[in-house]
């Protein structure tokens, strides 16, 4: 039985309007104690507004916000025991790294010796031990982001908020930083809310991902479930690439374009027999030299991407996206036969 106290960060019936524009529309959200949840969605979906409401940087038009059972809806950011890691780092260039990390402790009038110890511990957590006396212009962008993270961790907040913290880093630094963030969040069990527009980042750091659109939650689930079982056409198109076909379902048999195949997990999509939409991820398709006439397709384009060929094929008059093994696919071939793996195929209600 789930303990009600595990519901650590709770938003109830939250609405937020700016003038006549509805930004958040009657939203409910629960984040369990010690978990990391990411808000993901297109620009303007409301994810950053939610983070600002939780932080106390904006007030909801209506609704309530609870942290660890306490109603903080009208509390200032100083009284919410929250820290934010920003995209811009927001470090003071005239201060040493140690003074940057310890700035919040100083504002809380923490004794000097305790400050020094906590600064040292926080820098060790982010692999910057011994950096206390350096200055911002003496360290790299990735190190600056770790200083910003240490500055938040040193305060031991109840809730840690991340506002697109890795957007200014290159691809390799983003990868290492998201690994570090996830490692620290899990080891310290800090309840965390993360905002990003990057699907890979969201999947890498989160216990659960919330996809938003037009101020509402579309689906909240672990990353694997979102990808393999999207609950709407919007989500299917937003979470990675897919090709959507009209099909028919009968038990665990799926038919599309005259091609019938077995989908062992068909029941998990909770659809009745009959017409449906069939979503096919690019990795679910294998091209072979033989098959039934209903499986034949024409290769329209093939682009070499290093670890795979990115192919667009014409299958019964509709585009089919395919990721093909570079050791198997011949870029000179113009015709092939579609074979589907059940992994990477999902079903949706026909709208």
Swiss-Prot record:
EC number: 7.2.2.7
Presence of the UniProt keyword Cytoplasm in the record: no
Subcellular locations according to the entry: Cell inner membrane
Record field: catalytic activity: Fe(3+)(out) + ATP + H2O = Fe(3+)(in) + ADP + phosphate + H(+)
Family: Belongs to the ABC transporter superfamily. Fe(3+) ion importer (TC 3.A.1.10) family.
Signal peptide (residue range): none
EC class name: translocase
UniProt source species: Mannheimia succiniciproducens (strain KCTC 0769BP / MBEL55E)
Name of the protein in its database record: Fe(3+) ions import ATP-binding protein FbpC
InterPro entries in alphabetical order: AAA+_ATPase, ABC_SmlMolc_Importer, ABC_transporter-like_ATP-bd, ABC_transporter-like_CS, ABC_transpr_FbpC, Mo/tungstate-bd_C_term_dom, P-loop_NTPase, Transp-assoc_OB_typ2
Lineage: Bacteria, Pseudomonadati, Pseudomonadota, Gammaproteobacteria, Pasteurellales
Subunit comment: The complex is composed of two ATP-binding proteins (FbpC), two transmembrane proteins (FbpB) and a solute-binding protein (FbpA).
Classification via PROSITE patterns: ABC_TRANSPORTER_1, ABC_TRANSPORTER_2, FBPC
Start and end residues of each ABC transporter domain: 9-239
